[in-house]
């Protein structure tokens, strides 16, 4: 297991994937666990890593980030930048815009995985991940 220590709270999958490619000299199976909500593209690095190794992407997300709950005013904080703000989750427009954004991000992410030929799985926190992993490995075995 590689122990990649980020220098800041900002997510930089690109650097972490490059680290994997440079450090692991022999072919390995590498699991990348992340929410994959990043600002920089990592498609090229992922493609290179998957040519050298067997890369499996595991997206872990909180269901509340997918389906914004209707709870009125909510204070949110960007974990990477520290920026805080209030949003009105009772706004149908806001929840719809958030849902559209989520779906767009998932489409882009699935496109990256597909073009990089990387097997992937999405798991919500609190969800039974064992069954999803069994299905993934069953598909990989065929």
Task: State where each predicted segment sits.
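Acidic beta-strand-to-loop metal/phosphate-binding motif
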Residues: 29-35
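Von Willebrand factor type A / integrin I
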Residues: 22-26, 38, 44-142
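Von Willebrand factor
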Residues: 1-28, 40-42, 60-62
């Amino acid at each position: 297991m590689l122990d990649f220590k980020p220098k800041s709270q900002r997510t930089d999958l690109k650097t972490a994937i490059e680290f994997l490619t440079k450090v692991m000299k022999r072919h390995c199976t590498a699991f990348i666990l992340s929410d994959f909500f990043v600002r920089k593209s990592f498609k090229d690095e992922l493609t290179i890593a998957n040519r050298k190794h067997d890369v499996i992407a595991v997206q872990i997300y909180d269901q509340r980030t997918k389906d914004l709950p209707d709870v009125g005013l909510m204070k949110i904080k960007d974990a990477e930048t520290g920026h805080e703000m209030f949003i009105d989750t009772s706004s149908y427009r806001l929840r719809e815009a958030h849902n559209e954004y989520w779906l767009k991000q998932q489409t882009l992410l699935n496109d990256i995985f597909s073009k990089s030929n990387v097997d992937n799985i999405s798991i919500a926190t609190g969800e039974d991940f064992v069954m999803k992993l069994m299905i993934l490995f069953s598909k990989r075995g065929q």
